Amino acid sequence: MFKYLIFFLLTIVFGQDNLVVESSIVAKGLNKPLLVRFHPETNVMYVVQQTGEIVIINDKVPSENLFLDISDKIALSIMPGDERGLLGMVFDPNYVQNGYFYICYVDKDNHSVVSRMQVSENPLIVDKNSELILIRFEQPFNNHNGGHLEFGPKDGYLYIGFGDGGSRSDPFGNAQKLDNFFGTILRIDTNTDSGYTIPESNPFYNNKNKKGEIWSYGLRNPWRFSFDSMNGDIFIGDVGQDSWEEIDYIESGVGGTNFGWNIMEGNHCYLDSTCVSNQYINPIIEYPSDANYMKSLVGRKQTNVSGCSVTGGYVYRGSNINNLYGKYIFSDFCTGVLWALDYQKDIVYEITESVLSDDRHMISSFGEDIYKELYIVDFLGVIYKMKKGE
């Protein structure tokens, strides 16, 4: 716990020497890809598309037969700023034995849905009749839906991220309320036939006025979070409102953290300049953003703009890129810049990458295969694998 408290008192400084890596195209021809997952035994690549499909990649292109197609069930994103659709997927820790996996989507009635599904007798196709809905609640707007899913590497519980419900400035103050799921990371135990139970170690377990599923709260729109596979620490990319993007941190096993939104944006008071900021957990990284950037030049690099929408990534624990080992890799959806945080030395490096550096990219996510190697998901339809730089 002492390490946890010290960590948030340190200042992260950008502008260090760049780290050089390379990348190669491993999948293309995709339609609005948001996430990449890997079969826990074969390492075959599965890509989640916002349009409602999960596709399996063969020889760099989607296979002809879809693993899953729920495009008839989801609210399709049709307008700029509409973030609905199929948003998340994760394999059950025992997927090889039970065939279970979990998805998060926004349905046609504008409800966020978390459900469990199972593969059919053909392991390349899902049994659509197997869907068991675990969580379903109405979204007030069409953005800030969150939808990311991860299993904790140490406790085996399912963690689920949801945004504040959308619009501007969290108009209902959802993220500071504990009687709803908005602006939270949830933690549930899915090791039951009935759907899920709430772990007794959750901070609000058995509290009738608070949602027992909540693990952490005070988030605006957690766009991808992940666990350091070595120690179970959580890193969260939380998208800012107008001025600040942030990376938040939860030490393994520490629940009940309040990251401050909509009282705080990054390290700064948001609604009231005289807010009492020491009541909240500050981000380990913040960087300035321009909320209007995307309206003028999506995905084009500008030296005077840091970005407009953080994309959380992973702590690299692979064996092929020595200069990234132990560093947290993240990006920005609007600029496509790659960064690496050395959170032991409190230094952020910009990553120099020749394949991605000269073109338009909208980095919607990162992926980690069974060998702990990292992948970059470009919303424009391409998946890249990160490699050692020459």
Where are the model-predicted features located?
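Generic anion/oxyanion-binding catalytic loop in active/binding sites
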Residues: Y4, I25, I78, N174, ...
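Acidic, Gly/Ser/Thr-rich repeat motifs that build Ca2+-stabilized beta-propeller blades
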Residues: Q16-S169, R224-F227, G232-W244, S306-Q344, ...
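Beta-propeller domain segments
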Residues: A75, R84-L86, D164-E350, M386-G389
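A structural signal for well-ordered alpha-helical scaffolds and beta->alpha junctions
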Residues: K3, H111, L178-F182
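Beta-propeller fold detector
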Residues: S24-I25, S63-D72, I125-I135, T197-F204, ...
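Conserved blade-ending motifs and adjacent loop-strand segments that build the rim/top face
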Residues: L219, I347-I370
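Sec-dependent N-terminal signal peptides
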Residues: F2-G15
